[in-house]
UniProtKB/Swiss-Prot annotation:
It is an enzyme of class 2 (transferase). Catalyzes the base-exchange of a guanine (G) residue with the queuine precursor 7-aminomethyl-7-deazaguanine (PreQ1) at position 34 (anticodon wobble position) in tRNAs with GU(N) anticodons (tRNA-Asp, -Asn, -His and -Tyr). Catalysis occurs through a double-displacement mechanism. The nucleophile active site attacks the C1' of nucleotide 34 to detach the guanine base from the RNA, forming a covalent enzyme-RNA intermediate. The proton acceptor active site deprotonates the incoming PreQ1, allowing a nucleophilic attack on the C1' of the ribose to form the product. Pathway: tRNA modification; tRNA-queuosine biosynthesis. Its cofactor is Zn(2+). The lineage of its organism: Bacteria, Bacillati, Bacillota, Bacilli, Lactobacillales. Binds 1 zinc ion per subunit. One of its GO terms (biological process) is queuosine biosynthetic process. This is Queuine tRNA-ribosyltransferase. The keyword rRNA-binding does not apply.
Length: 382
């Protein structure tokens, strides 16, 4: 077995679910799990400083390989001393492979071949090519603690035969990426399980990848349009296929109920742009549900956004002030709203970890969902 750059330590299993309390040890520090990871697509979490992210308890952040490859360029980042030094972040960083962005830009399935993928840049329209070796090379230059193998991410509702061929290609690409990885002593590489909603294909993908001894395993191809029930069903049969001594990462998931349901099914790590993206539109997560701060009813509301939240935003500013800032397109409003939403999800996971320790995660979920409004008719996803 390979001596990996990152290690997972299991602390406790919850008695009534598949939830796990643990920690992940990386070259840039250790963080507790389950953990939500804020997304810093272009080497910054939008509107947030590294110091603020540390204050709210973000033990690890995510950056995007595709975007950093195009701008400023992975070789420039390497010259700067790696992503940690470039962005002044001394804690763990995870980078994705760029695959998800690439497939959103592919104009024809014929451009996906065994060798790699041809697509056009979203910046200037020039033709680009990315393959498993290049994706690993870029991430080696970036110097992230946790890297992703290059995978094909087909939409959830593709025909069986297409998904089968895609899974088989992803497995071959994973092996190529593993062979191309030139910094295994200080960067851990994860394999990504695909297979859409097909249990046998998820099983095949998990079997292929676990035979290669990656540092950890990601569950991809979810949060791409399927229902919450379908996502949970895939997790029900996929997570048990993954090794218990390795981290499990559910990609692209950030809705509060989905985070809790993922933890119940044995997932350790999550990421999503959701909290910062919706914050910039004035949508906020609170202990009492979703708040659209633009609504007129908050114009004269001089109470805290969330009386159960102790974040900087909620302890210093009112709903009326936040509404004013967002309506006026003031940058400070974007910052305050982003800070709150990130604090909310990071602290939700802290509460989830305590519920695992106390063996009452199912009761915690029931209480949280009732207060948040998930049990109401036509409840919003987030």
């Amino acid at each position: 077995m390979t001596e990996h750059a990152i290690k997972y330590r299991l602390i406790k299993k919850e008695k009534h679910t598949g939830a796990r309390l643990g920690e992940i040890i990386t070259p840039h520090g250790t963080f507790p799990t389950p953990m939500f990871m804020p997304v810093g697509t272009q080497a910054t979490v939008k509107t947030m400083s590294p110091e603020e992210l540390k204050t709210l308890g973000s033990g690890i952040i995510l950056s995007n390989t595709y975007h950093l490859w195009l701008r400023p360029g992975d070789e420039l980042v390497a010259e700067a001393g790696g992503l940690h030094k470039f962005m002044n972040w001394d804690q763990p960083i995870l980078t994705d492979s760029g695959g998800f962005q690439v497939y959103s830009l592919v104009q024809n399935k014929k451009n996906i071949t065994e060798e790699g993928v041809k697509f056009k840049s979203h910046l200037d329209g020039r033709e680009l090519f990315l393959n498993p070796e290049k994706a690993i090379s870029i991430q080696n230059n970036l110097g992230s603690d946790i890297m992703m193998s290059f995978d094909e991410c087909p939409p959830f509702y593709q025909p069986y035969d297409y998904v089968k061929a895609s899974v088989e290609r992803t497995s071959r690409w994973a092996e190529r990426g593993l062979n191309a990885h030139r910094r295994p002593n200080d960067q851990g590489l994860f394999g990504i399980v695909q297979g859409a909603g097909f249990e046998d294909l998820r099983r095949q993908s998990a079997s292929d990848l676990t035979s290669m001894d990656f540092a950890g395993y990601s569950i991809g191809g979810l949060a791409v349009g399927e229902s919450h029930k379908e996502m949970n069903a895939v997790l029900d049969f996929t997570t048990p296929m993954l090794p218990e001594d390795k981290p499990r990462y559910l990609m692209g998931v950030g809705a509060p109920d989905s985070l809790i349901d993922g933890v119940i099914r044995g997932v350790d790590m999550f990421d999503c742009v959701l909290p910062t993206r919706i914050a910039r539109n004035g949508t906020l997560m609170t202990h009492f549900g979703r708040v659209n701060i633009r609504n007129a009813k908050y114009e004269y509301d001089f109470t805290p956004l969330d009386p159960m939240c102790d974040c900087y935003t909620c302890t210093n500013y009112t709903r009326a002030y936040l509404r004013h800032l967002i309506k006026a397109d003031e940058t400070f409003g974007l910052r305050l709203c982003s800070y709150h939403n990130l604090h909310f999800l990071v602290n939700l996971m802290k509460d989830v970890r305590q519920a695992i320790m106390d063996d009452n995660l199912l009761e915690f979920r029931e209480d949280f969902c009732e207060r948040y409004g998930y049990n109401q008719p036509n409840a919003k996803d987030f």
